[in-house]
């Protein structure tokens, strides 16, 4: 995947909550993973675009002792320029005894096969001891295993708060894959001016990958969980808070949703220092734009970024996936992932919104991580449709 440099004129950053000094703790370690199962759910898109792959595995230390589990949730974004390769939106998570660590990137891998090349992926968050994690994961194949080298920081000080919800509506949409892989459960909780939307994708028996967006009057928070259940009564679920918008722009941490899905406990760290403004333009991209998948409609495109609206100076490439899900409790959840590839690094933007921005309204999504000059990046990017084939992007980020 190639990209060119971002050169953007300064723009005025939107007002942000006052920043406080933060205490960071560095964590660096290596583990090994070995895939034990790999299941593909095909939806019939050209060149496998839109196909969902769930990979499960075990995590060991250098001595070979089992120390955790791995789950990767992968969607094909586009065909690679290379023969017999494809570009994949890859969400990696490992669960160790003291928490879960999430990473995400668009990776180039052999078509329909496991990864073989070295990948450097942004660490986007975590739970437990890894709450608020931001940094990088280096993943390299060694024999029948993968070396996974983590290098990240976590916030030492986080502020606690609570939210409550009066009503919760949910619905499940099923496909025909074994073990229900790819089935989707949508939920929406509402309490006064606060609400949340969750999208749970079945990753195996008793395993769900869950994306969740909390909406308040002043901003939103985007979170992710890997839920493992052995049956029985419902339990509270911990989520990694990957980023936010509005007054929560740049925030990271952890939230816990209780067993009845009506009470939420949050531990959040706000960014320190001053945010950097950023701006560019994007074309509408090309690719698959209307593929039926379980629970919704999939879009997978790749496109170009420019310094100005005249498109004379290219500043990078981007890759995007988006699923517009079925309506739940009167709203339509739209889950979007964008990887922006600049010459000096990559930036991952993701989140759940209730509009795609094609109605003329600007849409803000969290920055959840990056590589190179954007390692550990947090903040937000706002998209505004200038015309049918041009988008204006403005934002701010901390790192």
Regions found by a protein language model. Name each.
Residues 1-15:
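Secretory targeting and sorting signals
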């Amino acid at each position: 995947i190639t990209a060119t440099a971002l050169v953007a004129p300064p723009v005025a950053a939107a007002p942000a909550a006052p920043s406080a000094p933060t205490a960071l703790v560095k964590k660096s370690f290596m583990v090994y993973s070995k895939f034990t199962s790999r299941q593909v759910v095909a939806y019939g898109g050209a060149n496998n675009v839109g196909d969902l792959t769930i990979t499960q595995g075990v995590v060991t230390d250098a001595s070979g002792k089992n120390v955790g589990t791995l789950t990767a949730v992968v969607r094909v974004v586009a065909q690679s320029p290379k023969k017999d390769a494809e570009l994949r939106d890859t969400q990696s998570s490992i669960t160790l005894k003291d928490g879960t660590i999430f990473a995400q990137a668009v990776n180039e891998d052999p078509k329909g096969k496991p990864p073989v090349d070295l990948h450097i992926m942004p660490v986007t968050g975590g739970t437990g001891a890894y709450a608020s994690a931001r940094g990088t994961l280096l993943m390299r194949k060694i024999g029948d295993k993968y070396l996974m080298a983590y290098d990240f920081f976590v916030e030492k000080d986080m502020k606690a708060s609570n939210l409550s919800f009066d009503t919760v509506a949910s619905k499940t949409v099923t496909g025909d894959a074994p073990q229900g892989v790819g089935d989707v459960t949508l939920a929406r909780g509402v309490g006064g001016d606060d609400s949340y939307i969750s999208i749970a994708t079945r990753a195996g028996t008793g395993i769900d990958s869950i994306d969740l967006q909390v909406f308040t009057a002043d901003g939103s928070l985007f979170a992710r969980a890997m839920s493992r259940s052995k049956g029985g009564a419902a339990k509270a679920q911990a989520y990694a808070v990957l980023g936010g918008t509005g007054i929560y722009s740049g925030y990271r941490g952890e939230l816990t949703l209780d067993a009845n899905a009506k009470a939420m406990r949050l531990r959040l760290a706000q960014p320190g220092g001053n945010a950097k403004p950023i701006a560019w333009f994007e074309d509408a991209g090309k690719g698959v734009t209307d593929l039926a998948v379980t629970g919704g409609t999939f879009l997978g495109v790749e496109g170009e970024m420019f310094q100005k609206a005249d498109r004379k100076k290219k500043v990078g490439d981007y890759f995007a996936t988006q699923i517009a899900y079925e309506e739940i409790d009167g709203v339509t959840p739209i889950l979007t992932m964008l990887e922006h590839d600049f010459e000096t690094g990559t930036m991952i933007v993701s989140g759940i919104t209730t509009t795609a921005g094609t109605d003329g309204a600007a849409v803000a999504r969290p920055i959840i991580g990056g590589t190179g000059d954007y390692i550990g990046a947090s903040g937000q990017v706002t998209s505004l449709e200038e015309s049918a084939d041009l988008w204006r992007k403005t934002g701010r980020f901390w790192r």
